[in-house]
Amino acid sequence: MRLRTWALAMLLGAPSCSGLIASAQYSAPATPAPYNPIALAEVTGAPRTAVQAGQNNYQTLSQNPYLGGVPSGKLSAAPVELSLEDAVTFGLKQNLGGVLATDAVIDARGEKWQALSSLLPNVVTDTGFGVHQVNVKASFGLSIPNEPPIIGPFGYFDSRAYLTQSVFDWTSIERVRSSQAQLKSAEFSSKDARELVVLVIVSNYLLAIADQSEAESAASQRDTAKALFQQASDQKAAGVASAVDVLRSQVQLQSREQKLISAENNLAKQKLVLARAIGLPLGQQFEMTTQILYQELTPSSLDDAIQSACQARADFQSQTNRVRSAELAKKAAFAERYPSLGAEADYGLSGVTPGSSHGTVDAAATLRIPIFQGGKVHGDVLRADASLTEERQRLEDLRAKIEQEVRDAYLDLEADAQEVTVEKSAVILATQTLEQSRDRFSSGVTDNIEVVQAQDALAIANDAYIASLYNYNVAKISLARATGVAESRYAAYLRGN
């Protein structure tokens, strides 16, 4: 059985198209796509087994923004209750990946205003006052009869407002439209980041629940091993069991105690991962209050899901706007060949002193006609065309990727549902086997080798059942992500609606 470890290694891998915005000057944070670091993991215990193997990529994990958060709030001495809905709410506000995506939208909005400034009026003012003295002969080589060679000192005052306005510049117009498409792309990327945040938070919450179930199962197995050890000791004292039976049961007890310690440690560490991803104060203790029971999900038809996925997926809409932005950028490059018309004007007061100043005005219009620019326009067009081709190819690749993710999610959902049924039956059979083995040992029919083997089989069956439940619930939320409804319908999918 494959074991997917979405919780800790959810977002490793190459950046997807959804987190990027096409611009030579601007690039939003990459939105990594979820991937499974352990493609084929044998069931040897629980979800934690594969996760520990995935922690070999710890450095990559620690650099992933979706696994970090911006801590907020005050530390409480008492443990706080944390439901799944609370965790998602905190994550949407404080997860680092979501916060960076929001900042990218602000950055794109600033770039749009920068492009728009070339079309809007520019007004500046300038005020100056000075005192001058001129040597006429030294400056101009003139001698004026009956006049001193030095004129002045005299004052000069000028206060003026300057206006520049682009009347027609098709290149700037297309660049503004391109930046508007970039802004829309950034906004859709931010929405896609929220989808990924929900995917990460829910998956980590599910893994924490699985670890908690593992710890409870390990505690139950420890109690059973303790009872078996006491039973073997009593039977040895009664002369029914041998010393090796006591030693065997004692070794089994210590093994179960060790597993309980490991399970509790894994649970504590997974809680730290979850707390960091949702931005809880460092060191804040919490208790998970949402219990995710087995609820079978019956999704819509595969064809309907594939058709609706592209329309619902924010990363697809983001990439569509990137293509639009690249198209407009190419038009802007072509428009560099077109003439442009601008206007300039100024009005102000000039005089010897502010009190004796008079109003003056200047106005001019400028027509610029490009004739030869050394091949710059041709180069800009080639680069813009290459960028457009790249974005179109990325869009088609993303379309195929979305369909693959939907198909994968449907396959996982069906397979994991079957595995839950099989593993639940295995737990029932293993429990019956342990009960019969204990009865046989109590009756003196056999030694406790059968009991130890049956207890090990039950432990493996319990762990596999916990893993199958975790995988099935992750398959649900993965389907919600693949169809673009993770934020709006994650709770309904987990409930089987």
For each predicted feature, which ranges?
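Amphipathic alpha-helical coiled-coil scaffold segments and their short linker/junction regions
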Residues: 88-92, 146-147, 241, 245-252, ...
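Acidic, low-complexity, intrinsically disordered peripheral segments
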Residues: 2-7, 20-51, 133, 282, ...
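Bacterial N-terminal signal peptides
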Residues: 9-19
